[in-house]
Design a protein with these regions (language model features):
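Electrostatic cytochrome c docking/interface patches
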Residues: 62-83, 96-101, 157-183
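Axial heme c-ligation environment in periplasmic c-type cytochrome domains
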Residues: 98-106, 120-166, 201-207, 225-257
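Bacterial N-terminal signal peptides
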Residues: 44-56
Length: 257
């Protein structure tokens, strides 16, 4: 008999989990497999669609810059085409993501955005990307250097619609960590690199202000776990922080302006 249809025998009076769940209990594994397959198909479809959209975006780097071996200046109009055709589904066309699962990109420093896109790409000699995200790896791999400059410049030029702090119970702890660090753990003040208002420093440290607390917290956890490994400095800092400290400072950052 097919193993999928076999059911364990139960003595009279014993608890039968299949009976408790009803006649659809045997369908649960199949439903789970179908749901997972649908997610894989959706992600693959998004990457294919992104590649097709990118193929229609003209690469208009100046011939003079190419001949001189210089990177062409960013083209914000071309970047907008990429953002609308490729990035909008998760981050919104203007970079103000509607979901806390996806970061807000609006007003982020162009150099930081470009670095992250490059970090999502596989490295030389078959080494894995420095940032591990299957969806972003597919998108980033479809972008050439000029397109990365273009879309990064476009998002940097957009106006941020900031998120907000939500947890009043943790605001004092979050403020203390952001402005003064955690001396006993060797955690420096966030403001030292990201500026007192969270605006960051162009070409050095990213803008944090107004970012979703959920996203910021998830990245601190990723640095601590080593699943995000493109900043040794942040990996060291995150390794010294507790879950509560991460949550507190992330929520405080969301309220910075």
């Amino acid at each position: 008999m097919n193993s999928f249809m076999q059911m364990p025998a139960f003595r009279k009076g014993s608890h039968n989990p299949h009976r408790a769940l009803g006649p659809f209990s045997l369908c649960v594994p199949l439903v789970t497999r179908l749901r997972n397959a649908a997610l894989v198909l959706r992600n693959a479809t998004m990457v294919i669609a992104a590649s097709l959209a990118l193929a229609m975006v003209p690469n208009i780097a100046s011939a003079q810059d190419k001949a001189a071996g210089k990177p062409a200046k960013p083209d914000i109009a071309a970047g907008q085409q990429i953002a609308s055709g490729v990035c909008a589904g998760c981050h919104a066309a203007d970079g103000n993501s509607p979901s806390p699962a996806n970061p807000k990109l609006a007003a982020q420093h162009a150099a930081y955005l470009a670095k992250q896109l490059h970090n999502f790409k596989p490295q030389a000699e078959g080494k894995p990307p420095e940032r591990n995200n299957a969806i972003m790896q597919g998108f980033a791999s479809a972008l050439n250097d000029q397109q990365i400059r273009d879309v990064s410049a476009y998002f940097a030029a957009q106006k941020l619609k900031p998120a907000a702090a939500k947890n009043k119970d943790l605001v004092e702890l979050g403020q203390k960590i952001y402005r003064g660090g955690i001396a006993e753990k060797g955690v420096p003040a966030c403001a030292g690199c990201h500026s007192p208002n969270g605006a960051g420093i162009p070409d050095q440290y990213p803008r944090l202000q107004g970012q979703y607390a959920e996203y910021t917290e998830s990245q601190l956890v990723a640095f601590r776990q080593g699943t995000r490994a493109n900043s040794s400095q942040m990996m060291t800092i995150a390794a010294r922080m507790s879950d509560k400290e991460m949550k507190a400072v992330s929520d405080y950052i969301a309220g910075l302006r």
